[in-house]
C-alpha cells in the first residue's frame, strides 16, 4: 500500500522536453541513451521501442555527423518518446536536428564554435521551443580548468558548468537543464550539491561511466540515492555498460525505493532460509519477468514462512505467507479465506496481480473523470 515520500524537493524552474515536464515539482523523468550506430536506423528505432516498452520518459541519441543527423530525422518519425540529440563541436548538426524536430539539444555552448555560432544555435532553439542540456563531465573538463585545479573537483565541475550557463544567460536563454557527472560517487554528489545552490534550473542526475550492470547499478543507487533523498534532481540516467533497458529498470527501482515515483510492482521478498514452504526465489524471478508490462503501482509481498510473512502482507497491496502445501493470501492487508496452492503459486499469483492491477486502473480512471467534471 502506497506511502508518500517524506522528501522535500528542491525548487527549480520548469522546462519541457517534448511533452515531458522537467522541474518545478514534475515527476522525476527517467532517461536512457541508445548504444547503436545512429546511422543504423532500424537498430536504433528497435532499441528505442524496447525502451518505450519499459517506460522510459526521454531517450538520448548521439549525433556525431551529418549522416547521423539525416538518420536522426528518420528515427524521430518512427518513435513516440521525446529524443535528445547529443552533439559536440559542430554547430551545424545542432541546427539540422532542430529542423528535424529534436526535443532537446545536449550541447556545451563553449565547445561548438565562436560566439556567432553559439548564437545561431541558441536562437534556433528559442524559435523552436527546444531546451538545451548543459552536460559537464569530470573526464572532459576544459584544459584551463584542469590546469587550475590539478584534478577534477566539485569546484572544477561547477566552474565549467557555470561557464556554459553564463553564455546562455548572456543570450537571455533560460530553457535549459544542467548535469555535472563524475564516475566517483563523492565527486558527483558534492558537485551537484554545490551547483544546486547556484542555479534554479532543473538538474539532470547521473554517475557517469558507472560500470557494468551490477556494480554500476550499486554505484548509481548510492550516488543518486543520496542526492534524491536531499531533494536534488529533476531527471536521471543510470549509465551502465549494459543493455539500456536495464538502465530504465534500475532508474525506476531507485525512485520506487525512495517513494518518489512508483511504476509497476514493488516486490517485497525474503532472502529465504530452511523455513520457506515454497520456492520464493523462483517465484519472484518468474513473476518479475511475466509482469513487466504492469505499470500500476502496487506492493506485493512474497514471504516463505509465517515469521515475517503476516506483518509484511498486512502493509502490502497483495501478500503471500508461506505454509505447508497451501499458503495464506492477503489483499489490502486483510487475510482472505482463500489459500494458494504452493504447487501452482506462480500462475495463481500472476492472475491475482493482474486482476488487482485492472481494478486499480479502473478506479484511477474513475477518479480522473470525476476531477474533469
Curated annotation (Swiss-Prot):
Alphabetized GO MF terms: 4 iron, 4 sulfur cluster binding; 4-hydroxy-3-methylbut-2-en-1-yl diphosphate synthase activity (ferredoxin); 4-hydroxy-3-methylbut-2-enyl-diphosphate synthase activity (flavodoxin); iron ion binding
EC number(s) recorded for this UniProt protein: 1.17.7.3
Record SUPFAM superfamilies: Dihydropteroate synthetase-like, Nitrite and sulphite reductase 4Fe-4S domain-like
Functional pathway: Isoprenoid biosynthesis; isopentenyl diphosphate biosynthesis via DXP pathway; isopentenyl diphosphate from 1-deoxy-D-xylulose 5-phosphate: step 5/6
Cofactor note as given: Binds 1 [4Fe-4S] cluster.
Cofactor annotation: [4Fe-4S] cluster
Catalytic activity of the protein: (2E)-4-hydroxy-3-methylbut-2-enyl diphosphate + oxidized [flavodoxin] + H2O + 2 H(+) = 2-C-methyl-D-erythritol 2,4-cyclic diphosphate + reduced [flavodoxin]
Gene3D superfamilies: Dihydropteroate synthase-like, Sulfite Reductase Hemoprotein, domain 1
Annotated positions binding [4Fe-4S] cluster: 270, 273, 305, 312
Iron recorded as keyword: yes
Key words of the record: 4Fe-4S, Iron, Iron-sulfur, Isoprene biosynthesis, Metal-binding, Oxidoreductase
Entries under NCBIfam families matching the protein: ispG_gcpE (TIGR00612), PRK00366.1 (NF001540)
Family: Belongs to the IspG family.
Function according to Swiss-Prot or TrEMBL: Converts 2C-methyl-D-erythritol 2,4-cyclodiphosphate (ME-2,4cPP) into 1-hydroxy-2-methyl-2-(E)-butenyl 4-diphosphate.
Classification via PANTHER family: 4-HYDROXY-3-METHYLBUT-2-EN-1-YL DIPHOSPHATE SYNTHASE, 4-HYDROXY-3-METHYLBUT-2-EN-1-YL DIPHOSPHATE SYNTHASE (FERREDOXIN), CHLOROPLASTIC
Protein name stated in the entry: 4-hydroxy-3-methylbut-2-en-1-yl diphosphate synthase (flavodoxin)
Provenance organism: Proteus mirabilis (strain HI4320)
Amino acid at each position: 500500500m502506497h506511502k508518500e515520500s517524506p522528501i522535500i524537493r528542491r525548487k527549480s524552474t520548469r522546462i519541457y522536453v517534448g511533452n515531458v515536464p522537467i522541474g518545478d515539482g514534475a515527476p522525476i523523468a527517467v532517461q536512457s541513451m541508445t548504444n547503436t550506430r545512429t546511422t543504423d536506423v532500424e537498430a536504433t528505432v528497435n532499441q528505442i521501442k524496447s525502451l518505450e516498452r519499459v517506460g522510459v520518459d526521454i531517450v538520448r541519441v548521439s549525433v556525431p555527423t551529418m549522416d547521423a543527423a539525416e538518420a536522426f530525422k528518420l528515427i524521430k518519425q518512427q518513435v513516440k518518446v521525446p529524443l535528445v540529440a547529443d552533439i559536440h563541436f559542430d554547430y551545424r548538426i545542432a541546427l539540422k536536428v532542430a529542423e528535424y524536430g529534436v526535443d532537446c539539444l545536449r550541447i556545451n555552448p563553449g565547445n561548438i564554435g565562436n560566439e556567432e555560432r553559439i548564437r545561431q544555435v541558441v536562437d534556433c532553439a528559442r524559435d523552436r521551443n527546444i531546451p538545451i542540456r548543459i552536460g559537464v563531465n569530470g573526464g572532459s573538463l576544459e584544459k584551463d580548468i584542469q590546469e587550475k585545479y590539478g584534478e577534477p573537483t566539485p569546484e572544477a565541475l561547477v566552474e565549467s558548468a557555470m561557464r556554459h550557463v553564463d553564455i546562455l544567460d548572456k543570450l537571455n536563454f533560460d530553457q535549459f537543464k544542467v548535469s555535472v557527472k563524475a564516475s566517483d560517487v563523492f565527486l558527483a554528489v558534492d558537485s551537484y550539491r554545490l551547483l544546486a545552490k547556484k542555479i534554479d534550473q532543473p538538474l539532470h542526475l547521473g554517475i557517469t561511466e558507472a560500470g557494468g550492470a551490477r556494480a554500476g547499478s550499486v554505484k548509481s543507487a548510492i550516488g543518486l540515492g543520496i542526492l534524491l533523498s536531499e531533494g536534488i534532481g529533476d531527471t536521471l540516467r543510470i549509465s551502465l555498460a549494459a543493455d539500456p533497458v536495464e538502465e530504465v529498470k534500475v532508474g525506476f527501482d531507485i525512485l520506487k525505493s525512495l517513494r518518489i515515483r512508483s511504476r509497476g510492482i514493488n516486490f517485497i521478498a525474503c532472502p529465504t532460509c530452511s523455513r520457506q514452504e515454497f520456492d520464493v526465489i523462483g517465484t519472484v524471478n518468474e513473476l518479475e519477468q511475466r509482469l513487466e508490462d504492469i505499470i500500476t503501482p502496487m506492493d506485493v509481498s512474497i514471504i516463505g514462512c509465517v515469521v515475517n510473512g503476516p506483518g509484511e502482507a498486512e502493509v502490502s497491496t497483495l501478500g503471500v505467507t508461506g505454509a505447508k502445501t497451501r499458503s495464506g493470501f492477503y489483499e489490502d492487508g486483510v487475510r482472505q479465506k482463500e489459500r494458494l496452492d504452493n504447487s501452482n503459486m506462480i500462475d495463481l499469483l500472476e492472475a491475482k496481480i493482474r486482476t488487482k492491477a485492472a481494478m486499480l486502473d479502473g478506479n484511477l480512471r474513475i477518479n480522473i473523470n470525476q476531477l474533469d467534471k
